[in-house]
Amino acid sequence: MSYFLENEEVNEAVEEVKAQDGIASIEPLLDNRIVRAIREMGFEKLSPIQEQAIPYLLQGEDIIGQAQTGTGKTAAFGIPAIQHINPDVKKLQTIILCPTRELAIQAAEELRKIAKYMHGIKVLPVYGGQDISRQIAGLRGVQIIVGTPGRVMDHMRRRTIKLDLVNMVVLDEADEMLNMGFREDMELILGQIPGEHQTALFSATMPKPILEITDRFQKDAKIVKVAAKELDRKSTRLNS
């Protein structure tokens, strides 16, 4: 069973999202249990970043999302991430990297809300400062980890996580992770994903090292850009 939309479907979906207002525009693309959960969460309208990113992520595209904090980025990648998970497979399928433990906890909580009615999906935040043995025990059966690069690397070195079924990697606030000295960890993690997968990178700014990461680890990435003031709606190829 494919958990990704076909190219024709995503093109139609993008046009439909642009033509409609509110979350009804993406509901046909989602599992009914996800729709139920996000409606309970109070979703009525899509933010510009959600409007642009969700259809492309559902189709399996790589994207570069340039947007400030507070623009709805977590749901923009969280809804497709939950949609892609196969609940019957109790192995790691998605890795989400965040710069701090606070952001990891916050993002994990939102993903759990989105997955509320998708029984069998397990989301776990991983970060430094936790008891490592308890964290290792908690990793059993987890399909999504949301963590800081250093702690994710720690688990990779310990071989307490396996990457063979990972099909989605998200870098949230990539510029902040860069500023905190996580570039090497980010690149090592991305370089260790063995199979075909999609990569979504979100960043408020696009310094040269971030662009170097996108050039190295993404393929034909879509740029989803939300201006800080006017929240313009653009979606173009990286090389356009």
Predicted regions and their residues:
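Conserved SAM-binding loop
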Residues: K45-L46, I96, I145, V170, ...
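Residue-level signature of catalytic and energy-coupling elements of molecular machines
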Residues: I38, Q50, G65, A81, ...
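N-terminal intrinsically disordered, low-complexity tails of helicases
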Residues: M1-E61, R237
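Interdomain coupling/hinge region of P-loop NTPase helicase/AAA+ cores
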Residues: A115, V123-V126, K162-A174, L178-R237
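Short hydrophobic/aromatic beta-strand immediately N-terminal to the Walker A/P-loop
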Residues: I64-Q66, I95
